[in-house]
Protein backbone atom coordinates (compact mmCIF):
# COMPACT_ATOMS: atom_id res chain seq x y z
CA UNK A 1 0.00 0.00 0.00
CA UNK A 2 1.21 3.49 -0.77
CA UNK A 3 -0.44 6.88 -0.43
CA UNK A 4 -1.21 7.05 -4.16
CA UNK A 5 -3.32 3.89 -3.85
CA UNK A 6 -5.39 5.59 -1.15
CA UNK A 7 -5.87 8.71 -3.25
CA UNK A 8 -6.88 6.59 -6.24
CA UNK A 9 -9.58 4.87 -4.17
CA UNK A 10 -10.99 8.18 -2.94
CA UNK A 11 -11.01 9.74 -6.41
CA UNK A 12 -12.24 6.77 -8.44
CA UNK A 13 -14.69 4.84 -6.27
CA UNK A 14 -17.90 5.53 -4.41
CA UNK A 15 -18.08 5.06 -0.64
CA UNK A 16 -19.56 1.77 0.58
CA UNK A 17 -21.21 3.50 3.56
CA UNK A 18 -21.91 7.03 4.70
CA UNK A 19 -23.44 8.90 7.61
CA UNK A 20 -24.75 12.44 7.84
CA UNK A 21 -23.73 14.10 11.08
CA UNK A 22 -26.43 16.42 12.38
CA UNK A 23 -26.83 18.04 15.75
CA UNK A 24 -27.77 21.31 17.36
CA UNK A 25 -24.41 22.86 16.37
CA UNK A 26 -22.47 20.01 14.74
CA UNK A 27 -22.83 19.04 11.08
CA UNK A 28 -20.79 16.91 8.74
CA UNK A 29 -20.36 13.74 6.75
CA UNK A 30 -18.60 10.42 7.31
CA UNK A 31 -17.65 8.31 4.28
CA UNK A 32 -16.30 4.73 4.40
CA UNK A 33 -14.45 3.13 1.47
CA UNK A 34 -13.31 -0.46 1.08
CA UNK A 35 -9.55 -0.71 0.71
CA UNK A 36 -7.41 -3.82 0.74
CA UNK A 37 -8.54 -5.78 3.82
CA UNK A 38 -9.84 -2.77 5.71
CA UNK A 39 -11.65 0.53 5.52
CA UNK A 40 -10.73 4.13 4.75
CA UNK A 41 -12.81 6.51 6.89
CA UNK A 42 -13.11 10.17 5.89
CA UNK A 43 -14.88 12.65 8.16
CA UNK A 44 -15.63 16.31 7.60
CA UNK A 45 -17.30 18.06 10.52
CA UNK A 46 -17.92 21.59 11.69
CA UNK A 47 -19.28 23.08 14.88
CA UNK A 48 -17.42 20.79 17.29
CA UNK A 49 -17.19 22.70 20.58
CA UNK A 50 -13.91 23.90 22.02
CA UNK A 51 -13.19 23.88 25.74
CA UNK A 52 -11.95 26.55 28.12
CA UNK A 53 -8.49 25.01 27.67
CA UNK A 54 -8.42 25.22 23.88
CA UNK A 55 -9.32 22.65 21.28
CA UNK A 56 -11.94 20.11 22.27
CA UNK A 57 -11.11 16.43 21.79
CA UNK A 58 -14.09 14.41 20.55
CA UNK A 59 -14.23 10.62 20.38
CA UNK A 60 -15.07 9.06 17.04
CA UNK A 61 -16.42 5.54 16.88
CA UNK A 62 -18.85 3.28 15.08
CA UNK A 63 -21.95 2.13 16.99
CA UNK A 64 -23.54 -1.29 16.57
CA UNK A 65 -27.08 0.01 16.00
CA UNK A 66 -28.67 1.05 12.73
CA UNK A 67 -29.68 4.63 13.49
CA UNK A 68 -28.98 7.59 15.77
CA UNK A 69 -32.60 7.77 16.88
CA UNK A 70 -34.52 6.77 19.96
CA UNK A 71 -37.10 8.06 22.40
CA UNK A 72 -37.37 11.36 24.28
CA UNK A 73 -35.96 9.58 27.34
CA UNK A 74 -33.09 7.96 25.40
CA UNK A 75 -32.59 10.03 22.20
CA UNK A 76 -29.81 7.82 20.79
CA UNK A 77 -31.01 4.46 22.12
CA UNK A 78 -31.19 2.87 18.65
CA UNK A 79 -27.48 3.59 18.10
CA UNK A 80 -26.58 0.79 20.51
CA UNK A 81 -23.19 0.40 22.12
CA UNK A 82 -19.79 0.88 20.56
CA UNK A 83 -19.18 -1.66 17.79
CA UNK A 84 -16.82 -4.33 19.07
CA UNK A 85 -16.10 -7.88 18.00
CA UNK A 86 -13.83 -8.44 21.01
CA UNK A 87 -14.18 -7.99 24.75
CA UNK A 88 -11.57 -5.23 24.78
CA UNK A 89 -12.41 -1.97 26.61
CA UNK A 90 -12.56 1.51 25.07
CA UNK A 91 -10.41 2.75 23.25
CA UNK A 92 -9.74 -0.73 21.83
CA UNK A 93 -13.22 -1.44 20.43
CA UNK A 94 -13.27 -2.63 16.85
CA UNK A 95 -15.09 0.55 15.80
CA UNK A 96 -12.89 3.05 17.69
CA UNK A 97 -11.26 5.59 15.37
CA UNK A 98 -8.85 8.49 15.95
CA UNK A 99 -10.49 11.45 17.75
CA UNK A 100 -11.62 14.69 16.14
CA UNK A 101 -10.33 18.04 17.40
CA UNK A 102 -12.53 21.13 17.35
CA UNK A 103 -11.73 23.79 14.78
CA UNK A 104 -13.74 25.77 12.25
CA UNK A 105 -13.87 22.74 9.94
CA UNK A 106 -12.37 19.38 10.86
CA UNK A 107 -11.20 16.89 8.26
CA UNK A 108 -10.12 13.44 9.37
CA UNK A 109 -8.73 10.63 7.25
CA UNK A 110 -7.89 7.23 8.70
CA UNK A 111 -7.34 3.64 7.60
CA UNK A 112 -8.24 0.68 9.78
CA UNK A 113 -8.06 -3.07 9.41
CA UNK A 114 -10.32 -3.47 12.47
CA UNK A 115 -13.38 -3.78 10.24
CA UNK A 116 -14.21 -4.02 6.55
CA UNK A 117 -17.24 -2.66 4.71
CA UNK A 118 -18.81 -5.17 2.34
Language model features: what each stretch is:
Residues 1-118:
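N-terminal leader/targeting pre-sequences
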Amino acid sequence: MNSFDLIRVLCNTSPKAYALITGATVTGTMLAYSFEEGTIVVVEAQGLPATGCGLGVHGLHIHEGSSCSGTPENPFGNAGGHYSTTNCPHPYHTGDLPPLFSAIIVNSFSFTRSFAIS
